[in-house]
Regions:
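Cationic, low-complexity basic patches in intrinsically disordered or flexible, solvent-exposed regions
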Residues: 5
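GNAT-family acyltransferases
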Residues: 9-12, 20-140, 157, 161, ...
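Membrane-interacting alpha-helical segments
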Residues: 115, 119, 171-181
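Conserved catalytic-core motifs of GNAT/GCN5-like acyltransferases
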Residues: 123, 168-170, 188-206
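Conserved acetyl-CoA-binding loop-helix of GNAT-fold acetyltransferases
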Residues: 135-137, 143-160, 176-184
């Protein structure tokens, strides 16, 4: 499940206050160096930090009902709505939520028509060394191993640069492709989250997948 950010830092702070590590740990993380969202390269892909200029490219997934089937919001009705969603995502400090756009390489060059999807981390809790991952792919690019390649390099960034101990993925039972991808990367299915969220006023159940740094094969 790809997640769009909705919570402000104030909401995160309230959540931190409820955590058993308390507000002191929240304020400690606020004094850490600013979180960076670097470009990440693989053999076939480049992952770049999301920017507002990506609106037209991103609309290829945000405006596609098939691509958005397992997303936590309905498809964008037009380009303007996609732009608003990107602006909202970009307003969140990358300490909590960050998104990469995924591009294929062609003769070492990148172009708008080579955009294939996105990967993000969200719900990050630095004091618990935990975050969640989401990904979304243009359907015509499925079955080529692109998203596994993209998620793998993001996992490497999370476990090393961000010093994450646990990564979670919340996947609907019907989303068989994403479940298989998570399992290929080493995630373990840990439980069922019944009616965990509502999309278009309909409840959705998710399965929780978890990957510990000690389980990760790199």
């Amino acid at each position: 499940m790809f997640r769009e950010p909705r919570a402000s830092v104030d909401t995160v702070a309230a959540s931190a206050a409820d955590d058993n590590r308390g507000f002191d740990h929240y304020h400690h993380t606020m004094n850490e160096p600013a979180t960076q969202v670097p470009a990440l390269d693989t053999a076939r892909l480049q992952l770049r930090c999301l920017k507002i200029e990506d609106t037209t490219a991103v609309h290829r997934v945000y405006g596609d009902p098939e691509a958005m089937r397992y997303w936590d919001m309905p498809p964008s009705i037009d380009l303007k709505e996609t732009e608003r969603r990107l602006a909202r995502a970009l307003s969140v400090d990358p300490q909590w939520h960050a998104t990469w756009t995924v591009w294929t390489r062609r003769d070492g060059q990148l172009a708008d028509d080579q955009f294939i999807g996105m990967v993000n981390y969200h719900a990050r809790q630095p004091w618990n060394r935990r975050l969640a991952l989401g990904w979304i792919l243009i359907p015509s690019f499925q079955g080529r191993g692109y998203m596994q390649e993209a998620v793998r390099v993001v996992l490497a960034h999370c476990f090393t640069t961000l010093n994450t101990h646990r990564v979670e993925a919340e996947i609907e039972p019907e989303n068989v492709r994403s479940a298989r991808l998570a399992q290929r990367l080493g995630f373990q299915r840990e439980g069922l989250l019944r009616d965990r969220l509502f999309v278009a006023d309909q409840p959705r159940t998710q399965q929780m997948y978890g990957l510990l740094r000690s389980d990760w094969g790199g």
